[in-house]
Amino acid sequence: MDAQYNPRTVEEVFRDFKGRRAGLVRALTADVEDFFRQCDPEKENLCLYGFPNEHWEVNLPAEEVPPELPEPALGINFARDGMQEKDWLSMVAVHSDAWLLSVAFYFGARFGFDKNDRKRLFGMINDLPTIFEVVSGKSKAKPPSANNHSNSKSKSSNKTKSSEPRAKQPKPQPQPPVKNEGREEEGGPDDEEGGGGGGGGREEEHGETLCGACGESYGADEFWICCDICEKWFHGKCVKITPAKAEHIKQYKCPSCSGGNGGGGGGSGNGKRARPS
């Protein structure tokens, strides 16, 4: 509607943006009754225009195809009576925000703004609350630093969680895990079969466990052993237990549970739980 006005620098485009934005905000706030009245659903497709001089207008779209400037949302009047007024105004505000950006970056593209120009223009625009934020009362946004910190923390947390299953996949154990000799005797052969089905769940649980001595997580090529007293897992190297030595330990006790003597146990068999290296 005002194609003759062509700002050519970042500052001029931003000034154009602010003027159009001010007009649209006025239409949806201070002049809302007049704006509501002009958007008659009985009329043809209507658009809300904002101008650099901070005025606004409800009018038909430009006749030329394609138009000289990007056009705002078409037919905003048709939805007026089919929605709550607050929701309708919010919908118009969202479309107006999109239109303002399209006009600003149309000028940027037309007059050859480079990467730094576009970045600076967007930064200047982004410092202002959107029309939707003004109309909906959400213009008091959180400080950018707080949002960036929250987003960074969330992304970091998601990245860590998604990578954990790949980093902690345990190797298949050569035999089903054995809880202890007493429970096996009570459960009998049937319980051993059921235990085989639960082994995968135990591996998954231990894949998230940290070493009770050094606090590090499980590595796929490391030998681990579990204390049958406190149920904590340890790197074999941290408690000085090798796979060969573990084969001769019936019930393993970590250094804390065995009084600090380096851990161990008596007898033969395979009652302890261990992860192969």
Curated annotation (Swiss-Prot):
Give the subcellular location. Nucleus
- Domain comment (free text): The PHD-type zinc finger mediates the binding to H3K4me3.
Compositionally biased intervals (Gly residues): 259-270
Q: Which family does it belong to?
A: Belongs to the Alfin family.
Q: SUPFAM superfamilies, from UniProt? A: FYVE/PHD zinc finger
Q: Which top-level group of life is the source organism from?
A: Eukaryota
From the Swiss-Prot or TrEMBL record, give the protein name: PHD finger protein ALFIN-LIKE 9
Q: Where are the zinc fingers (PHD-type)?
A: 208-260
Q: Which GO molecular function terms does the record list? A: histone binding; transcription cis-regulatory region binding; transcription coregulator activity; zinc ion binding
Record text on subunit structure and interactions? Interacts with H3K4me3 and to a lesser extent with H3K4me2.
Please give the organism.
Answer: Oryza sativa subsp. indica
Q: Where is this region: Disordered?
A: 138-206, 255-277
Task: Give the site residues for Histone H3K4me3 binding.
Answer: 218, 224, 228, 233
